[in-house]
Design a protein with these regions (language model features):
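Conserved glycine-rich cofactor-binding loop
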Residues: 10, 17-18
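Residue(s) in the substrate-gating loop at a strand-loop-helix junction
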Residues: 154
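Conserved glycine-rich Rossmann-like NAD(P)H-binding loop of the short-chain dehydrogenase/reductase
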Residues: 33-49
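Short C-terminal tail/terminal secondary-structure segment
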Residues: 2, 111, 159, 241, ...
Length: 284
């Protein structure tokens, strides 16, 4: 098998330059894909430029960033399509081979304290944006089943964590849409979701000790979450002190599974939620 099985393919990745998204961008570029990466905040501009330069130099691929506010369901899809057309070809010859709907926002609220504004904010980014971005790119998907769509969900869709009325609800919606799209787009692309558990990053550290305590019984049952000597010393220390000796996933561990679903070898897998959580959930 080629070490660059995605040579010449075009991937669109939302939330492409931070956390899991940056790891996905790196993974796809290393396999030869050109990447149109979408980011929202000005604070990501420098990190996007740095990653673009590093990946283009390392892998000889084309990486382009487009800034688009995914909470704007009309403007952001238009900007993404225009950027793809400008950099990778006009409508008549543009093909988007891979779409990774990764961007997401969180918000933890007990049921009695859910603000209406937060409902609209979180559902706009986590549910409506994947719908509208996928819809906008639909004309450019392959017509031979070779396309790949991967939606980044979460174990929050099924675990019933306290305070996850909004976040867990959006991820359950995304998984339901994954199954629908797998049928609707069967002649164009496979459509799957990946459901990480705890992942090292801003959202995980911001959740704090109360949430880590809620996770503890689930993490203790996850066979791959136990820290080892090969893990980063500071993470081992923190896990042993605060997390019952269990660690969150590294970004690359999730990105590798996403990459598997983007490759030609995943052609017979569609409509599935593929676990990427160290065994916190046992299912496909």
């Amino acid at each position: 098998m080629s070490s660059r099985p995605l040579e010449g393919k075009l991937a669109v990745v939302t939330g492409a330059f931070r956390g899991i998204g940056a790891a996905i961008t790196k993974h796809l570029a290393a396999k030869g894909a050109n990447v149109l990466g979408v980011y929202t905040s000005d604070s990501s501009t420098q990190s996007a430029n740095d990653l673009i330069n590093a990946l283009q130099e390392a892998h000889g691929v084309k990486i382009v960033a487009v800034q688009a506010d995914l909470s704007d369901s009309e403007e952001s899809p238009r900007r993404i399509v225009e950027a793809a057309q400008a950099m990778f070809g006009h409508s008549e010859n543009l093909t988007v081979n891979i779409l990774v709907n990764n961007a997401g926002v969180g918000g933890d609220y007990p049921l009695g304290e859910v603000p209406m504004a937060e409902f609209h904010r979180i559902y706009a980014v986590n549910v409506l944006a994947p719908i509208m971005v996928t819809q906008a790119l639909l004309p450019f998907l392959p017509r031979d089943r070779s396309g790949r769509i991967v939606n980044i969900s979460s174990v929050a869709s099924t675990m019933g964590f306290k305070t996850h009325t909004l976040y867990g609800g959006t991820k359950a919606a995304l998984e339901a849409m994954t199954r629908t799209w797998a049928r609707e787009l069967a002649e164009r692309a496979t459509v799957n979701a990946v459901n990480p558990g705890p992942v090292e990053g801003d959202m995980y550290w911001a959740a704090g000790e109360d949430f880590w305590k809620q996770l503890e019984p689930f993490q203790l049952a996850a066979p791959l979450s136990a820290v080892r000597d090969t893990d980063r010393p500071e993470l081992v220390r923190l896990a042993n002190e605060k997390m019952a000796g269990r660690r969150p996933a590294y970004w690359t561990e999730v990105a590798d599974i996403v990459g598997m679903l983007c490759g030609p070898e995943s052609a017979w897998c569609t409509g599935s939620v593929v676990c990427a959580n160290g065994g916190l959930r046992f299912s496909v």
